[in-house]
């Protein structure tokens, strides 16, 4: 069989950071804008030279697509729109609020996913780009088993989770080791009788661990030729779109010959001449490739420091705003309302992972102030509603 090595490049776009502020410079989101513009420019150049590379984008909606990019970099939105139409780029779901999906109630989770697709403010992926794949690349790769049924109810085809060689991972260390054939193909995850597809996903660390993307692709293909792998494989590299990994370092010779130093241009060029390589997207690959393995785990996953939730849960500040969140939820429940409660939208916005971490031991002061404002406001709204209800009765 003429098995192929499919390669996809995923850009995780969130311009609202826990460790940087809200200014259009390197102390805020200026680096995001610079690097994303360069990614689009380099991808376009490659396509114009006949290289059929495709990008996969997962945008956060509330802050990036709704506020920051329209004001400071509308050309990025236009550039991705053009690439979707002209070169087959794909948009997948992150979550409306770059939210901690695994920490949400059913109603909060549903809103985060549904509003990411389309919403009244016009910042949904379908609103902006005209289409999206019902595949979720959750913010910080946060996933909780009990939400499989919710993903299925919402028509989600698959979830992308890190299966990484470094402790910035999701599920590699909590299941038996997968063979390369299965590790680079979709797998079926099952929890309490409910199943969904998980797409193993990789970072720049996995590329560096292999030596280079070319080395990784050639190693997998050699196993295809030897019969160790009897299927196509898909290397899906997904990293923050502001990562320097995507940007050429422009090093002088001979340093510029070192692998992984020429950004997205180098990552594409080093495999573009391999006849067994096909450029693809998660949605494109899943259309023609079924899961090859069944996996089970019962832990929550996240890609924080040393893999896990400590980056978002262990600071005293985290406990303060989480207590307020639970208080607002309790008031809403007492009022026999959740998605219709006065605090609901504020709760969804507070549940942005950025209001909890990844930064440690403290967040950017602008981010802390925003989280404190939101959390205080949601409680006050619920208290006011409770007082109003008592007066009516």
Feature roles, as predicted:
Residues 136-139, 237:
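Short, conserved catalytic/metal-binding motifs centered on acidic residues
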Residues 1-134, 141-197, 214-231, 261-276, ...:
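Catalytic alpha-helical scaffold of carbohydrate-active enzymes acting on polysaccharides/glycoconjugates
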Residues 135-136, 256:
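A generic structural signal for short
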Residues 2-30, 34, 192-196, 200-203, ...:
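Active-site and substrate-binding clefts of carbohydrate-active enzymes
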Residues 205-217:
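C-terminal accessory segments of proteins
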Residues 98, 165, 203-205, 286:
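Residue-level detector of flexible, active-site-proximal loop/helix-junction positions
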Residues 69, 104-107, 211, 248-252, ...:
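Short, solvent-exposed loop/turn segments at secondary-structure boundaries
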